[in-house]
Amino acid sequence: WVHHPFDGDGMIAAFKFENGKINLTNRFVRTKEWAEEEKSQKFLYRGVFGTQKEGGILANAFDVRLKNIANTHVIKLGDDLLALWEASSPYSLNPNTLETNGLSDLKGVLKKGEAFSAHPRFDPGHHQSQRMVTFGVSTGPKSTIRLMEFSTEGENIGSLLSDRKDSFNGFAFLHDFAITPNWAIFLQNAISFNPLPFLLGQKGAAQCLASKSDGAPKFLLIPRDSGKFAGQPPKSVDAPKGFVFHHLNAWEDNEKINIESIFYDDFPSIGPEDNFREIDFDLLPEGILKRSEINPTENTFTCSTISNQCCEFAMVNPHFEGLKARFSWMATAEEKEGNGPLQAIKKIDLSNNEEISWSAAPRGFVSEPIFIPSQESKSEEDNGWVVALVWNSIRS
């Protein structure tokens, strides 16, 4: 077993709607490391979240190779499916067969092994063209964000449209971000990284992260090259306490910026001695959806809670990315309060916080819900379908 589900190899699922039926196809991403381990039938690489090779500390010490597991997200860019993992380059797949073509450098944009976010954002056309906005992070005492925009339409689909780099003081754990027409918004968590246990083979890299109780989280606001602040330096604004993996959406309200994010009281981690199959959820912080209003001019923010129910993997209608959206869909715990496994899918009206839910409990567990808008009625924000994989433990 892997020590943590996040160390698992990427498997892509494809839903095909034909003749009134749904066909499901799924295949592992045939990464170089997957092929090696499949052949040997054992772990040959350490996992970021704590999976170790056989042989104990001596076998793992000073082996700092990262296994590209291509397991976090999948997107379509031109004729390619791209399987993403934020610490390295994407893998290209055939969208029809899901066969693995190999690593992609995106037409020479990425250097070998360069970090490339698993959570790009798709601008629906704020500047008369649809584009993918994404980033890569180089971490250290001083961290650098590379912000990139790619065309997603026309003859130049997949071409790089803009590229800028900005550096910030401190270690940056940036898993996700949000966009508006003029800004790319990051939340730099107050977190530290002690690499020694990783180097000595005692922990995975992510297990060496720890929240800094005396740290000061910051919103990092980077002007988009397609927006009205192009070429200006980034802004740094104080942010709420807590830890954020994922953001829901962001939008501009005159000179202020609103961003909706899922906050944890602390960085949730599974230690070397823990077993993820026997986790006591009451001992782990839950994700709570909150809204922050940022005033870049005055370097201030306000923060309010949208829902107290434990949730993750929230999204809006893709046509409203970067705009004020009314509806959101997300995975939640079954109970209304407290932590727990994700067993339900919730739709929330962000204008009044009204909610409706569908539950797979007690023996069903949901994956990330995807909202697919109807092509027939784009004006109705919540007209579409919600697609998700559900694990039925009764049948497994």
For each feature predicted by the language model, list its residue ranges.
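Beta-propeller domains
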Residues: W1-S396
